[in-house]
Every structure is written in structure tokens, then in C-alpha cells.
């Protein structure tokens, strides 16, 4: 069975990336002492992109290129595993991108494992984004079945990236089970409501020993920047790009926001102060006191 997409990733073509006008030394990830790694593989981009909800496969392809993403996730239920159909979604994934099949729609651990095995057989990749979402109203991840599936998949040789609730205890359990990342939700899938779980994500970031990828609910580039600023290692975005008026432009905006957020985190973003009054950034008290007679129009100044 011929593979269309493999785990082997290229060094991204500079023409594909929003930061392509900069040198390698200017890139906030390449050559930095904390590059983005998943299971030992280094990726240049910290933006992961999904493939659902696009108006057409060509629009999806162009948006993926504009995003500069190295990793693209696709629901196994949308893939023609028999490879008999024409125009399958995988045919429009740009060459060299790392495919991350997901088990979207799985109701329990057994179904998730079955989908993952089918995907591995069809694509040749052991990477899998684990999703177990039995509640059709919220698509909330089932914590019990997610952990159970993670244990089964790791034992079966998969590199598991689990979508999970923003629960620090569950995140620790998934890490202990051998997951390569944890992927806490920002808010409900497809809701575009941003980081409603910010406090919990910060707690996960503080203790996680594997990359933290914020997944679900990221509705604007500012949400992606916020996630990166508080220390997330990466973000996964789909709906906000796919349903934008201009998906290609939105993909580029998310790419730049992810880079900016990461740079802000590395630069040491100041925490919000506790003061309830303003604090001048440039006090003039000493300066005014040194001016004979003060300044006209200011307290103590000339008329």
C-alpha cells in the first residue's frame, strides 16, 4: 500500500513560512536552546493545524502552506483508508508535512484503538492524536476512556498525543502512561471561545514533563498568542482558520501570533501587578524638582 504522507519531515521551504524573509538566526525556534520536540523529533513550527471544515480541499491546502505548520491532523473517519476514492483529503496535504491522524468520533478506548490501528496500517505513521468524545453536545473528552486508550496505545507502539480536559491530575496520569504530549482544551471544540481554562492550563504547564499543546476553542490569533505567552509549547487550530472569511490570511495570522506569543514567553512576559492604582513608567518628580521655578502650566510651575 503506497504511502501518501510519512513522518519524515523536510526542512520547511522558506517560501512557505511567514518568517521566510528572516535568516536562520532570526527564527525564534531554530537554533534556540529549547526547540519544540515531540518524541525526539524537532519541529520548526509550534502551530499545528487541522483539516476539517474547509470550504474545499484546495483552500485547505493553501491554508496549510500559509500556516507554516509542520504537523497537520486529520480525522481517520474522513480518510479513504481503501484509497479507492479520488480527491481524498490526504491528496491535498502538502508534501513533507507530518501527518497526525486523530481518532475523532471514537466513543470509547476500544474504538479509538481500532481507528488508530487502521490509520497506522493505511498511512504508515505511529503518531496518533487520541480523541474519545462520547458526548455529542459538548464533544468533551472522556477522561477515563482517554487514559485507558492511552495506556493501550502506548503498549501497542503508538506515539500518543491525547486531547484531554484541562485537568492537571489527568495530565500527569497521561504523562505517566507514556504519552508524548498532553493536549488540554482551551474551551469546547469549535466554539472559538478562547482560553476559558487558562488557570488550569497554567497549572499543567508548570508541572508537565512533556510538551503542552493547547487544543480546541482557540478562536483568534490573540488566543494563540495568549496560550504561548503563558508557557504552552504549541497550539492546535482548525475551526478559526477554516471558517474565516479568508482562511489563507487567517492561517498566516495564526502563524505570526504563535511566534509572537512564544517570543514574549521567552522574553519574560511581566505578570499582572496587584496594585489597584496606576504606576507611572516614567516618573517626572525628580526632573521637575530640578527645574528652577518648575514648568509653566504644571503644579509649582510658572504662569
UniProtKB/Swiss-Prot annotation:
Q: Which InterPro entries match?
A: Aldolase_TIM, Thiazole_synthase_ThiG, ThiG
Enzyme kind, highest EC tier? transferase
Enzyme Commission identifier(s): 2.8.1.10
Does the keyword field hold Cytoplasm? yes
Q: Where is the segment annotated Disordered?
A: 1-37
Q: Which GO terms describe its molecular function?
A: thiazole synthase activity
Which pathway does UniProt place it in? Cofactor biosynthesis; thiamine diphosphate biosynthesis
UniProt keywords, alphabetically: Cytoplasm, Schiff base, Thiamine biosynthesis, Transferase
**Composition bias, Basic and acidic residues:** 1-35
Pfam families, sorted: ThiG
Q: Which SUPFAM superfamilies match?
A: ThiG-like
Question: In the UniProt record, which is one GO cellular component term?
Answer: cytoplasm
UniProt-annotated binding residues for 1-deoxy-D-xylulose 5-phosphate: 190, 216-217, 238-239
Q: Which residues fall in a coiled-coil region?
A: none
Protein location: Cytoplasm
Assembly behavior: Homotetramer. Forms heterodimers with either ThiH or ThiS.
Name it: Thiazole synthase
Protein's organism: Parafrankia sp. (strain EAN1pec)
Amino acid at each position: 500500500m503506497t504511502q501518501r504522507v510519512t513522518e519524515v519531515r523536510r526542512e520547511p521551504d522558506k517560501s512557505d513560512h511567514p518568517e521566510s524573509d528572516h535568516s536562520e538566526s532570526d527564527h525564534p525556534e531554530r537554533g534556540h536552546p529549547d526547540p519544540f520536540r515531540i518524541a525526539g523529533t524537532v519541529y520548526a513550527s509550534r502551530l499545528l493545524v487541522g483539516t476539517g471544515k474547509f470550504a474545499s480541499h484546495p483552500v485547505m491546502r493553501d491554508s496549510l502552506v500559509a500556516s507554516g505548520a509542520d504537523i497537520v491532523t486529520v480525522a481517520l473517519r474522513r480518510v479513504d483508508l481503501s484509497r479507492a476514492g479520488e480527491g481524498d483529503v490526504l491528496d491535498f496535504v502538502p508534501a513533507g508535512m507530518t501527518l497526525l491522524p486523530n481518532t475523532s468520533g471514537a466513543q470509547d478506548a476500544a474504538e479509538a484503538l481500532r481507528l488508530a490501528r487502521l490509520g497506522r496500517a493505511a498511512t504508515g505513521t505511529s503518531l496518533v492524536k487520541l480523541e474519545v468524545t462520547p458526548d455529542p453536545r459538548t464533544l468533551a473528552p472522556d477522561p477515563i476512556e482517554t487514559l485507558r486508550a492511552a495506556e493501550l496505545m502506548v503498549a501497542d507502539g503508538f506515539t500518543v498525543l491525547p486531547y484531554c480536559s484541562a485537568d492537571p491530575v489527568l495530565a500527569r496520569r497521561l504523562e505517566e502512561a507514556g504519552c508524548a504530549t498532553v493536549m488540554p482544551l482551551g474551551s469546547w471544540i469549535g466554539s472559538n471561545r478562547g482560553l476559558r481554562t487558562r488557570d488550569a492550563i497554567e497549572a499543567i504547564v508548570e508541572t508537565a514533563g512533556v510538551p503542552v499543546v493547547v487544543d480546541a476553542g482557540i478562536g483568534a490569533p490573540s488566543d494563540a498568542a495568549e496560550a504561548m505567552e503563558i508557557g504552552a509549547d504549541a497550539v492546535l487550530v482548525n475551526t478559526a482558520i477554516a471558517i474565516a472569511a479568508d482562511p489563507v490570511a487567517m492561517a498566516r495570522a495564526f502563524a505570526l501570533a504563535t511566534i509572537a506569543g512564544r517570543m514574549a514567553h521567552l522574553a519574560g512576559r511581566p505578570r499582572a501587578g496587584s496594585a489597584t492604582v496606576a504606576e507611572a513608567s516614567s516618573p517626572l518628580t525628580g526632573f521637575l524638582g530640578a527645574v528652577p521655578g518648575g514648568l509653566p502650566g504644571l503644579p509649582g510651575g510658572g504662569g
